[in-house]
Amino acid sequence: MNMMNMKKQWWHEKVAYQIYPKSFCDTNEDGIGDIRGIIEKLDYLKDLGIDIIWISPLYQSPFVDQGYDISDYYRIDPAFGTMEDFDELLCEAKKRDMYILMDLVINHCSDKHEWFQKALKDPYGEYADYFYFEKGRDGAPPSNYRSYFGGSVWQQIEGTDLYYLHMFAKEQPDLN
């Protein structure tokens, strides 16, 4: 596409700011930033000229990888607040003509996610298709590929000759 012919989109003139909730603003003094802390700082962010707030994962997670290992995409992690808090954040941002952009991790999930637990119980069943399962080669992983976090991208499923793929931590199986 020719940049000269590109249609201007609403976000082209907007200023975005990423918030990592865990370290942003802690309102309940537990040492962890929370959704209420983001709400509390909306006026400040608006005064800075921020139009779009990009929020790093705040879904339920065991926090092996700072929340990027999501165990439930439908729940807010209690460390950050509640779904009601999140609904309030959306309403308060809208009042200020601000947008909320959520960081959605779809490459992988947590090994604690219900789908992965079901896949482990039946590596040839329906949920196994949600992940990458491969047989090993002569007692070794299916390939010599390396994880971004070090070591093999393959983790053996205990008691089997099957491995699952994880480009990041072994606790973050890749989704198919």
Task: Identify what each model region corresponds to.
Residues M4-N176:
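Acidic/aromatic-lined carbohydrate-recognition and catalytic surfaces
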